[in-house]
Amino acid sequence: MGEKITAKVETITPEIAKTMLGENVNNRRISRDNVNLFAREIRNGEWRFNGEAIKFGKDGRLLDGQHRLLAVIAADKPLTTLVIRGLEDETQQTMDSGKTRTLGDVLTLRGEKKSTQLASLARAVYLADQLGMEAAAQNDLKPTRGEIISFIDQTPQLADVLAASRAFRSQSGDMLTSSMFASLWWTFAHIDTDAANRFFTSLASGANLQADDPILILRNTLMAQLHKAGRSTRDNRVRIAALTIKAWNKWRKGKPLRQLKFSAGESFPTPR
C-alpha cells in the first residue's frame, strides 16, 4: 500500500463488511450490545454520515470499526461511511480515547434543559411505555438514541414526569431511584393520573397513614432496604417494582395490607 494515507467515502455492503473483518487482528473485545444497537440504528434509518471512519493500517489490517462492520452484517443493510487506509499500526492505541457523546450531550446540543436527567428518565419511561414495567425494571434493552429522541419529541407529557420526579425526590430522598419512580409514575398515571399523584405524595411523606395502609407498608419496606448492598441489582429492581405495583393494586381497591412480599419465581404483577 505504500506510505500514502487515503480517505474515501464508501458504501459498505454486508459482503464487503465480511471481507474487511477478515483483516481484523488484535482489535477490541466485541460488545454484542453495541453491535445490536448499531444494527437497529442502521435498520431504522437512524444512522447518519458523521465523518467517523473505518480505519486500516498500512498493511491492510483493520484498526477501528469492527462494531460498525458487524452491525452492517447483522442489519443486512449497507452503510455509507468514511474509510481511511494507510495509517501506522501504532495509531490504534490512540483511537476511541475521547469521551463518547451521550444522549444527554445530544439533548444539550438540541437546547434541552436538564438534559442528563431528561435522558435518564426518558429512557426509563420509554421502556415502560413500549415493553411494560417488568422490562423497565430489568433495564436490559438498550434503545437507540434515535428511538429515545423520537419518543421525547412525540411525548410532551415527559414534562409532567420530570416535575413529578423532582417533587417526589425533594420529599423522599433516595427511596426510589429517579428512573424507577419515572417508569412507575408513568405506568400508574396511564391508569389514573390523579390517583398516581396521591399515591406517590403519600409514599413520599408517610403522613396520615394507618398501620395497615398499603402505602405505609410499602414505605417501610423501601426505607428498610434503602442503604442495603445490592439495591441496584437487576433482581432487586424487579422486586422493588413488583412490590410497588402490589401496594398500588391493594391501595386502589381500598384493601388493608399486613405484609408485602415478592418471591423468586413469582409472576410479575399487573398494575390495575
Per-region residue spans from a language model:
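Solvent-exposed functional surfaces
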Residues: 75-272
